[in-house]
Amino acid sequence: MTLLQRIELERGKREPGEITELNLDNSKSVDIEGLTDEYSSLEVLSMMNVGLQSLAGLPCLAGLKTLELSNNLISGGLDALLKCPNIEQLNLSSNKIESMDVLIPLAKLSELKSLDLGNCPVTSTENYRKKAFAMIPSLKYLDGLDENNEEEVFGNDFLNGGLDEEADGVGIEALQQSGELEDDEDDYAPGEDEEAELDDYDDVDDEDEDDVEEDNGANLSAANVSGPRRPGTKRRHEDIQDGKNGGNAEHCGTKHKHTEDHVETHVENGSTADD
């Protein structure tokens, strides 16, 4: 797909002035064609791996902030970038730029903060980084590193004015001091349906506990295990025993009478044996 065809595809039914971002990566053209100054709202333009050899067809794009031109065949003519005076981030990595002199026009881009020339022959120049920072006063990051070889930490947020929480004053500490963060338990108030459901759960739990206590008491009694028990369990166990004793009183009296008769019979039999 040619660059012109890709532009038409990305545009669709929109007016050029409505488009703020345009991705034309991997389309094919040696020159920039199809772009006009009608794209006045364009802020991000990407033309990676297109095969560009020249930037001469680049239109005036005053609002453009990010321009991606990596993996092309550009070796010079960077003065065309002055048509976009507000560029902040420029990626020219993996191109054919060999000389530091080719970079001189970039010194006039007063908003340029991040420049990437990785995999370009120019990076082999002695003191390349030092010379580049000296040449472009506004430059903060070169190939992802600052002058002290520290990595670029803010990325696009830095280019957009910084979005860190300290700058905005909306960090965790600020929220805590303002009272915005409170304990969830203080805010939560269950509705009537939820309270009824919770009460049902409590009743079920109480019944389950009573059943467990009765079972434990019965098991301990059957095993003749003595020891401290929970008061509720002991009372229930004594009530059960009293009920059993009351219900079996008549049987106990019968058993006692039977025992006395058995003793008397035994005595009589003993006497007979002695006689």
UniProtKB/Swiss-Prot annotation:
Biased composition (Acidic residues): 180-216
Every LRRCT domain range: 120-158
Cellular component terms per the entry's GO annotation: nucleus
Key words, A-Z: Leucine-rich repeat, Repeat
GO molecular function: histone binding
Biased composition (Basic and acidic residues): 258-267
Gene3D superfamilies, alphabetized: Ribonuclease Inhibitor
Pfam hit, one: LRR_9
InterPro entries: AN32, Leu-rich_rpt, LRR_dom_sf
Transmembrane segments: none
LRR repeat ranges per the UniProt record: 18-39, 41-62, 63-85, 86-107
Region (Disordered): 176-275
Record flagged with keyword Repeat: yes
Cystine pairs: none
Similarity-based family: Belongs to the ANP32 family.
Full protein name: Acidic leucine-rich nuclear phosphoprotein 32-related protein
